[in-house]
Each structure stands twice: as structure tokens, then as C-alpha cells.
Amino acid sequence: MGEPADVPEAGQKKKKFIMVVDGNPKDALTTSMILQNFGYSVTTVKSAEEALEFLSIAVPSLVIAEFILPGMNGIVLMDRMRRDPVVSKVPVVVQTSDPDPSGRDRCVEAGCILYLRKPVTGEDLYRAVQAIIERTPRKNVRVPTYLKASVEGTGTGAEFVTVISEQGMFVKTLHPRPLGSKHTVSFSLNKKIIWVEAMVLYTYGFGEESAKDPGMGMKFMSIEPADLALIKTYIQESFSAGTPEGPPR
């Protein structure tokens, strides 16, 4: 059964591919790691020339490019892409440190779908990517995880929270509960046991969809504010893991 937009879905689906074009190694790594932590497949190149070479052999779902690049700039890159029928429809987001206020108009005129000024937060990047390439954009940041869980205190040892957001979670289990049923779920997060009351909004049985884990998407109905704050912090730390700045302190 299909899942609502704001509740995490099962894993194992094919990852969408994003290309990051940035000559600044730190910025390129930051953007790449955040996108990977959100579950996307990412390739990073440092120039427009490298980007065009790569685009000749692979077509990404999205290109995120710096305007200021060594050699060709982002405007030239977008112009070359628009002239190539194979990649002309690939959306381009410009994410730049360029201080020139006229840059936005120039990039939009060249064909970029969105213009972002650095630094860009992980939440803003997530929502931008969701809005552009996902069929059902999600309002809440969700991250993949693997937390041992217990539903109604009867954990079998084979139930895990595999995706989590501020609004809900996906529980991987061979025994999904009935749609609309409410359950007490506990899971360990950073050495603390979190208890939530959650309702089943959609399920996947074993073998129903080969690309989906069996289990259930659950919406939080009741959760302590302190526990919700822990989940928010965990999500922030998860999507910033591996970046030069690392998780926020």
C-alpha cells in the first residue's frame, strides 16, 4: 500500500543520482555527504568541463553546481547542457558563494531552476532536492538508520526502525500490524530508550514489492517533548555526518 508524504518509507529502493559541480573541495564534500546521508547517490566533479564529460556517459536526476568554477563558469555549463538533447531536461540548482546580486537573474535566465546562496543548511538542501526531483516531496527531513525496536513490548529481535523523521518512522518487520492500529513502540537512541505511541499508516508484506523492506510506516501520535528533541538532534547529526564541520554540537 502506498505511503503518505510525511511518513518515512521503506528502504531498498533505487537511489536517485545527483551530480555536484564545485571547485571548492570543502563545499563539494559538504554537499556530497549531506546528500548521501539523505539516501541519494552522488558524483562530485570540480569543473564544468569534467561535468560535461561525465554527462556524456551518465544522466543524473539533478545537477547542483557552483556558479564560480575554474575554466567555464556555471552559466556556460547550463548553456552547454541546454544545447544537448540528452541532458537538456536535467534540472540545475545553482549553489554559490558569488556575492554579485545580479548572479541570480543571470543564472535563472540561463536555465537554473533554483538559486541558493552559500552557506546552505542541510534542511534547506533537503527540501530543495525533494521539491525538484521527488514525485511526492516530503516536508520533514528523514534519515536512514537501524535502531532495534520493540512493538507493544514484544520485540522479536527482528524489528528495527530503518527510517526516522520528526513525524514518524518506518519499522522493518516480518509482521506488519493492521492499518490504522495504534501501538506503543520503543527503540534505543543514543543510549536512551524512546517510547512513542504510533499509528500504522501503510504496510509492505514480505515479497509484496521486491524493492521495499517488509514493515510498516508509522506516524507519531504521542511523544514526550524531550524525546522529540533527541530525535531532532539525531537527525541533524545524521545528515551532517562526514562533512568537514561534522555533527552540530
Where are these regions (language model features)?
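Structured alpha-helical
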Residues: 1-249
